[in-house]
Amino acid sequence: MKLVRFLMKLSHETVTIELKNGTQIHGTITGVDVAMNTHLKSVRMTIKNRDPVHLETLSIRGNNIRYFILPDSLPLETLLIDDTPKSKTKKKDSGRVGNRGRGRGARGRGGPRGRGRGRASGRR
């Protein structure tokens, strides 16, 4: 399972996030998108060497996140189960084999010319 898919399942969980600049953010996840952009509510943001600031909501760009600190009570076994539907691969007909060698109609060096621009074949 991809990390982002796991994080997308963490809605309504309270986590601590550390950013690359050292800022720590504690809040409840409202959503995570495929770019790992994270949206939080009831946020306490502690910028390095400053007093904490309380915010109602906060959105964090995914590439600024260093790591997530998850609560110990989180049921990781159930969250890590990959429940995304698998795409079915199309089966080819067993009697017919395609795309083997150049065969008729091959393009490129030495292949048949095709219809072209109306040059007379054999005349010069």
Curated annotation (Swiss-Prot):
User: Which SMART domains does this chain map to?
Assistant: Sm (SM00651)
* Spans annotated as Disordered: 81-124
Question: Where would I find the Sm domain in this sequence?
Answer: 2-74
- What keywords would UniProt list here? Cytoplasm, Methylation, mRNA processing, mRNA splicing, Nucleus, Repeat, Ribonucleoprotein, Spliceosome
GO CC terms of this entry:
catalytic step 2 spliceosome; commitment complex; cytosol; nucleus; pICln-Sm protein complex; precatalytic spliceosome; small nuclear ribonucleoprotein complex; SMN-Sm protein complex
Query: Where is the protein situated, by its record's location annotation?
Result: Nucleus; Cytoplasm, Cytosol
Establish whether keyword Nucleotidyltransferase is in the entry. Answer: no
Region: 9 X 2 AA approximate tandem repeats of R-G, residue numbers: 100-118
- Residue ranges annotated as compositionally biased, kind Basic residues, are 87-124
This protein's major location comes to nucleus
* Gene Ontology molecular function: RNA binding
Q: Which PROSITE patterns match?
A: SM
Tell me yes or no: is Ribonucleoprotein among this UniProt entry's keywords. yes
Q: sequence repeats: which residues?
A: 100-101, 102-103, 104-105, 107-108, 109-110, 111-112, 113-114, 115-116, 117-118
- GO terms for biological process? mRNA splicing, via spliceosome; spliceosomal snRNP assembly
Tell me what PTMs the record reports for this protein. Methylated on arginine residues by Art5 and Art7; methylation is not required for assembly and biogenesis of snRNPs.
Alphabetical list of PANTHER family matching this protein: SMALL NUCLEAR RIBONUCLEOPROTEIN SM (PTHR23338)
* Function, in words: Plays a role in pre-mRNA splicing as a core component of the spliceosomal U1, U2, U4 and U5 small nuclear ribonucleoproteins (snRNPs), the building blocks of the spliceosome.
- Family in the record: Belongs to the snRNP core protein family.
Subunit composition and interactions: Interacts with the SMN complex.
The protein's name in its UniProt record: Probable small nuclear ribonucleoprotein Sm D1
Organism, by scientific name, is Drosophila melanogaster
